């Protein structure tokens, strides 16, 4: 919570309501904070903006020979909550109640809102040399010289919109790219071998929770 406060992502809240906070263990043993917004989501008018179809995205990458994959740093947290709506995001912790100034994970409209933003700012480049899936951005080109110019345009858009990438999760000007569980190289699309291995080694689900985790992996 201190990190979120220091970053200006949350502030103390006086709202008479709030969502509970849960913690989920990640693969490296650290904990991920999750906020249970189910009650809020039930009364939220759903944003019907369509999430891109994965198959359509792969079709656009097939003829490219150079790729850069960009990962936005804490993507949702780069989107400001509308003024006056902050109390709706209140969560209750052992240290008190806090409300988000940026878009938290767990809101039903968060993916569609973020997708709308990405498609809006990259609209001139979509279907030409950029594909976007939520906070994953792939820049693709047929030649290296062309790729450098495409990257310049993309970075200019990110700078103008004050969006920041996580450099350690990015790959620049590569002859192949791994995107949404697939490896794309020489105009061909292959399943990511790490995904195949994970499916093969997955223990048979013993309950509903484990089944959901498995379905999430293979989807």
Language-model regions, residue ranges each:
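Retroelement reverse transcriptase polymerase core
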Residues: 1-219
């Amino acid at each position: 919570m201190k990190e979120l406060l220091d970053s200006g992502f949350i502030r103390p809240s006086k709202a008479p309501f709030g969502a509970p906070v849960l913690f989920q263990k990640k693969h490296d043993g650290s904990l991920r904070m999750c906020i249970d917004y189910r009650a809020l989501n039930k009364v939220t008018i759903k944003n019907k903006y369509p999430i891109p179809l994965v198959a359509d995205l792969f079709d656009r990458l097939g003829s490219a020979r150079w790729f850069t994959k960009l990962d936005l740093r804490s993507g949702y947290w780069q989107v400001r909550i509308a003024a006056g709506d902050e109390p709706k995001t209140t969560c209750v912790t052992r240290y008190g109640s806090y409300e988000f100034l940026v878009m938290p994970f767990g809101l039903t409209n968060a993916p569609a809102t973020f997708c709308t933003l990405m498609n809006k700012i990259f609209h001139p480049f979509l279907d030409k040399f950029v594909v976007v899936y939520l906070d994953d951005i792939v820049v693709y080109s047929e030649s290296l010289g062309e790729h450098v110019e495409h990257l310049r345009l993309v970075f200019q858009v990110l700078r103008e919109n004050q969006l920041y990438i996580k450099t350690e999760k990015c790959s620049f000007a590569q002859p192949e790219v791994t995107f949404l569980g697939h490896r794309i190289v020489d105009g061909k699309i292959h399943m990511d071998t790490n995904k195949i291995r994970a499916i093969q080694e997955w223990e048979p689900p013993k309950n509903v929770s484990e089944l959901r985790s498995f379905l999430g992996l293979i989807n």
